[in-house]
Amino acid sequence: MTKRTKKAGIVGKYGTRYGASLRKQIKKMEVSQHSKYFCEFCGKYAVKRKAVGIWGCKACGKVKAGGAYTLNTASAVTVRSTIRRLREQTES
């Protein structure tokens, strides 16, 4: 393992290189891409990133397409809520 500090966290491996603001941006992306997410199918926190945009649940084995660094992108959440709203309007 590479040397890390409490403040730098996952980007401690970069040391003093690349500048503080770029390391902060990278830290946000790397923390989100390495964390576990909630599976909509089985209800467990077991979804992890397999590759860029491919997310798989270790509990139930489902594979889902998502964002590069997060499971759900902001635009996908907006589209999903819009579809749900339109579906409710047509049903009533």
UniProtKB/Swiss-Prot annotation:
Residue spans, zinc finger C4-type: 39-60
Origin: domain of life: Eukaryota
The keyword Ribonucleoprotein is annotated on this UniProt entry: yes
Entry keyword set: Metal-binding, Ribonucleoprotein, Ribosomal protein, Zinc, Zinc-finger
InterPro entries cross-referenced by the UniProt entry: Ribosomal_eL37/eL43, Ribosomal_eL43, Ribosomal_zn-bd
Gene Ontology CC, one term: ribonucleoprotein complex
GO terms for biological process, alphabetical: translation
Single Gene Ontology MF annotation: zinc ion binding
Family: Belongs to the eukaryotic ribosomal protein eL43 family.
PANTHER family reported for this sequence: 60S RIBOSOMAL PROTEIN L37A-2 (PTHR48149), LARGE RIBOSOMAL SUBUNIT PROTEIN EL43Y (PTHR48149:SF1)
Name of the protein: Large ribosomal subunit protein eL43
Gene: RPL37A
